[in-house]
């Protein structure tokens, strides 16, 4: 017989919660002012025209319009918004 009582030890419970990062509105999709376009850690995507950036590097729309992704110099990826008035005309 065992001279010590068996004590269970859990090896689970260490996983951190997912942060739900990534692109939320893709290129060509319509968005409204204030909509979050990209959640990211650091500047994986840089703000272009009509895009604001929060203190946690979240990119958001400043105007209503269509989302546009483009590659700038040195392979920098930019997100911009083509305003709704420009797309209608």
From Swiss-Prot:
What keywords sit in the KW lines? Answer: Ribonucleoprotein, Ribosomal protein
Family matches, as InterPro entries = Ribosomal_bL27, Ribosomal_bL27_CS
Write down any Gene Ontology CC term: cytosolic large ribosomal subunit
Signal sequence extent: none
Cited Pfam families = Ribosomal_L27
**Is this entry keyworded Ribosomal protein?**
yes
Source organism's superkingdom? Bacteria
Q: Name one GO biological process term.
A: translation
What GO molecular-function term can you cite, just one? Answer: structural constituent of ribosome
Output the PANTHER family linked to this UniProt entry: LARGE RIBOSOMAL SUBUNIT PROTEIN BL27M, RIBOSOMAL PROTEIN L27
Family, per the entry?
Belongs to the bacterial ribosomal protein bL27 family.
Please give the name of this protein: Large ribosomal subunit protein bL27
Species name: Bacteroides fragilis (strain ATCC 25285 / DSM 2151 / CCUG 4856 / JCM 11019 / LMG 10263 / NCTC 9343 / Onslow / VPI 2553 / EN-2)
What is the name of the gene encoding this protein? rpmA
């Amino acid at each position: 017989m065992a001279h010590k009582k068996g004590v269970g030890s859990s090896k689970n419970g260490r996983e951190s919660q997912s942060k739900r990062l990534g692109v939320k509105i893709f290129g060509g999709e319509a968005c409204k002012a204030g909509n979050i376009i990209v959640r990211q850690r650091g500047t994986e995507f840089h703000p272009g025209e009509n895009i604001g950036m929060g203190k946690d590097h979240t990119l958001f729309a400043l105007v209503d319009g269509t989302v546009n992704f483009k590659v700038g110099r040195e392979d920098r990826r930019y997100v911009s918004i083509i305003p709704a008035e420009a797309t209608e005309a």
